Structure formats: structure tokens, C-alpha cells
A protein has these predicted regions:
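Short, amphipathic alpha-helical "recognition" segments used to contact nucleic acids or chromatin
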Residues: 1-3, 195
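RNase H-like nuclease fold core
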Residues: 15-104, 111
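Short alpha-helix plus adjacent loop in nuclease-associated cores
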Residues: 121-142
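Short alpha-helical "recognition helix" segments of helix-turn-helix
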Residues: 7-12
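Acidic/histidine-rich catalytic cores and adjacent linkers
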Residues: 51-53, 61, 86-111, 115, ...
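Non-catalytic alpha-helical coupling and interface elements of nucleotide-dependent molecular machines
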Residues: 1, 13, 24, 28, ...
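Short, acidic/turn-prone active-site loops that include or flank metal/cofactor-
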Residues: 70-73, 117-122
């Protein structure tokens, strides 16, 4: 998989179509050979490969890639779920607010709890604040507009993360622009909702925030966020069960961009195979000791210590994020 179909075809003297057919057989073989362990906490996200959004499934607990599919259509998600024989093992599914994902989970994994990724929600608060900032530019001098644009990142950072200089600049802007101050405080208070570990406190904080927001001059800027939380309330607040997010999968897109740069001329299927079927990228672990099976074997005198202590048996958890990143940095994939 280190060469494109065209390069292989030229080197062995056959046409590109023949190489493509051989590759399909190879992929089918590897699909059977590498059966990744079903995640207890499944992440659904998307990555852009060859200019299109693709479905990526991750194991949140183990920080691995579980699978990558050519599109994120509801039918594709449903079909992939149906291929998981032990899908009842899945307890939580994290996602963004893409309804086809939710519909697919409710259809095939009705026992699993849907969790909307918190970072997709709080990002909307940042977008609302930035929209207020943009609306104020019309009343500023050209110098003020340039300065506010250059320092917009200060507005988007959490207040407790600002250094002394940034805090001074923020106070200056908010002191001169009351509308920006109000929008900024709403952004900070929305983030504050997710700082508590207590779900009841989280609900209370949101209720108070929503009331203040709808009574403010910034309500139009935040209306999309309010509507999203109203429509996905249960799934958003399921976050407090385990505080699960897809945060680490944000690195996927940068990873894939590196893969694409290294593999100009590759098809989606070839890039997918380079990632999923590269055994040196796989994270493995010894299975947990099955005490009930051990006790049963002892009871019926069928105990075999070699089978229980088989060092060759491992669980394949998928493509490890950290290993993938390290190999890409070395140009080794």
C-alpha cells in the first residue's frame, strides 16, 4: 500500500483495473482478519478525505479509531451498526447534532444513550459572541476594527485562562462596548454550566442562563444556540452521566490532512486501508480475566490452565491515535 494503483500497474505490467480488483480482495481479507473490539463508548464524528465528509467511528474509552466509512448518510451508519454482532455492549454514543446519526442510533441501538458532544454546543456560544463583535465593527474606526479583529481570540478564551495583558485588553474593550460586554458575559456563563459535575446543578444553571439570555439585547445572536439546546436537551445533558466528549477526535482532521499529503493520488479506499489495516498502529491488550468462566471450569473439572493463561490471545482495540500521530510525524505510514 505504499504505491498508487497506477504505479503498481506500471511496475508489474498489468492494467490499473486489475490492480483495483486485487486491492478489493485484499481489503475484504483484511476486514475479516482485523476485528476490532466493540467500544463501550462509541464516538461518531466526521473527517474530510478527498474533499468529502466521511463517517468516522471511534472508541472513546480507548482513544482509537474503530472504523471509517465513505459517507455519513443515515443508511451507511445503520448498515455499519448492523454489522456489529455484539452491539448491545455499546452503552453511550457521542455525536454532534446531526439528526441522521441520532435516528440511526435510536433504530439499531435503542438501548444506548445518545450524548451530544459538549464542544459542538459551546462552540455555538463562541460563534454567537463573534457575531456580536462583527456587528459592532460598523460603528468603529478602521484602526479599532483591525485591533478588535486581531484580538478576537481573547474574547473566545475562557476568562480564567487569560494572562495579565489579555485581561487588561479585555477589560478595556468591554468597558467601552456595553453590548460586547453583555454578549461576553453570556458566553462565559454558558461555559460555566459545564464546569459543574452535578447534573441537577447543570440544569439549574442552564435554566438561569436561558432566562437571562432571552431577556438580553443579545438574544438574537444566541437564538440558534437556545434553539439547539431546546431541540437536543436530553442528549446534551446526558453529558453529565460520564462527561464523555469527542474532544480528542478533533485531531483526526489534521491527521487525515497529513495522510492525504503523503498519499497524493490515492483513492478513499486506499487511504482508509493504509490507516485501518496497518498492524503497527493497532492498540492491543490482554483480555480481562473471566472469573465466572474460571469458576465454572473448576466446578465441572474442565479447567485448562494453558487456555486461561494463553499469552497469544489479545484484544485489538483499533487504530491508536497517539501511535498514528507519531508515525505520521516521522513520515512512516
Amino acid at each position: 500500500m505504499s504505491k498508487t494503483f497506477v504505479e503498481v500497474a506500471e511496475s508489474v505490467g498489468v492494467d490499473e483495473k486489475t490492480i483495483g480488483n486485487v486491492f478489493k480482495d485484499y481489503v475484504a481479507l483484511k476486514e475479516r482478519e482485523y476485528q476490532f473490539e466493540t467500544p463501550k463508548w462509541l464516538g461518531i464524528d466526521e473527517i474530510h478525505i478527498i474533499r468529502r465528509p466521511r463517517l468516522v467511528l471511534t472508541n472513546i474509552e480507548c482513544r482509537t479509531i474503530y472504523d471509517i466509512k465513505p459517507n455519513r448518510n443515515k443508511e451507511t451508519v445503520i448498515q455499519r451498526f448492523l454489522e456489529i454482532s455484539d452491539r448491545t455492549y455499546i452503552e453511550y454514543v457521542t455525536m454532534d447534532m446531526w439528526k441522521p446519526y441520532k435516528d440511526a442510533v435510536n433504530t439499531i441501538l435503542p438501548h444506548a444513550k445518545v450524548v451530544v458532544d459538549k464542544f459542538h454546543v459551546v462552540r455555538m456560544a463562541n460563534q454567537a459572541l463573534d457575531n456580536v463583535r462583527k456587528s459592532l465593527k460598523a460603528h468603529m474606526s478602521q484602526k479599532e476594527r483591525r485591533t478588535l479583529m486581531r484580538e478576537r481570540f481573547i474574547l473566545l478564551k475562557r476568562k480564567h485562562d487569560l494572562n495579565e495583558r489579555e485581561s487588561f485588553l479585555l477589560d478595556t474593550w468591554l468597558g467601552n462596548l456595553p453590548a460586547l460586554k453583555e454578549a461576553y458575559e453570556l458566553k462565559e456563563e454558558f461555559y460555566w454550566i459545564w464546569d459543574t459535575p452535578d447534573p441537577d446543578e447543570g440544569h439549574l444553571r442552564y435554566s438561569q442562563w436561558r432566562h437571562r439570555c432571552m431577556s438580553s439585547n443579545s438574544k438574537d445572536a444566541y437564538k440558534d444556540l437556545v434553539r439547539a439546546v431546546d431541540n437536543w436537551h436530553v442528549e446534551i445533558f446526558n453529558y453529565f452521566d460520564k462527561r464523555l466528549t469527542n474532544a480528542y477526535t478533533e485531531s483526526i482532521n489534521s491527521i487525515i490532512r497529513q495522510v492525504e499529503r503523503m498519499g497524493r493520488g490515492y483513492s478513499f479506499d486506499a487511504l482508509r486501508a493504509k490507516i485501518l489495516f496497518n498492524e503497527k498502529l493497532h492498540k492491543k491488550r490482554k483480555p480481562r480475566f473471566n472469573s465466572s468462566a474460571f469458576n465454572k471450569a473448576m466446578l465441572y473439572d474442565t479447567f485448562n490452565w494453558y487456555e486461561v493463561n494463553d499469552h497469544d490471545i489479545t484484544d485489538n482495540l483499533g487504530v491508536d491515535f497517539s501511535t498514528l500521530i507519531k508515525n505520521l510525524e516521522k513520515g512512516d505510514l
